Amino acid sequence: MRIGRAAVAATAALLIGAVGCTNQIAGTATPDPTQPPLALSDDGYGIVAGYPDAPVQIELYTEPQCNHCEELQSAYGGDIERSINLGELAVTYRPLTFLDTPSTDEHSARVANALFLAVGAPEATDEANMSSGLEFQRFVEDLWAHQEPGGPGPSDQQMAKMAEDSGLPADVAGRVGDGEAAGNVNIGEMAAYNYGALIGIDPISTGTPTVYDLGTKQKVDLHDKDWLATLLSS
């Protein structure tokens, strides 16, 4: 347990609709222990924002064009951000791209790529360019606030500005703005893996956003507006 952990009540009143500083050691950068870390999940297809020993660990399945996913970030993003910062919560983001069509200019895939660019590869990243989980959560909130369902979505340059505004390192913003392909994941394989995992959680009501409690191995009821407060107080 970390000093100063306290329960954070969810302040959002919106009920979500249908679920549909680092030290250099031997040339390798290590995350700043005073900041919530950011890392790839063990399977390589998720992005973990938060301390690995946070008492509440969840997965969040989300699609960049899903309006209900935007509603979740709008309603709960601030509380998620604070809880990550306090060490109470760690979120494994699992992006999906099933809403991409020929008319969307790979909207969802490009946003997912930007998310994985934010993580980078620690062995290839100097200490000035390590992202934190807190910065990443802010980036997620900004991206989903600027979604364009059914359209091409934000440009690479617009996403780079969001990354910069979220506090992510300049190196990350530059890579996003250049439209660089993330070297730590294959977006197509990631989307297929995460969709399969989502079906495994709920093969009947399969949709986004879906929150999965890694502690209880249960899907969280997002129709309960107090779902986050309940998790943090359990």
Predicted regions and their residues:
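Structural alpha/beta surface segment adjacent to cysteine/selenocysteine redox centers
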Residues: 70-152
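Alpha-helix initiation and N-capping motif
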Residues: 77, 136, 156, 169-170, ...
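C-terminal cap of thioredoxin/glutaredoxin-like
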Residues: 24-25, 160-234
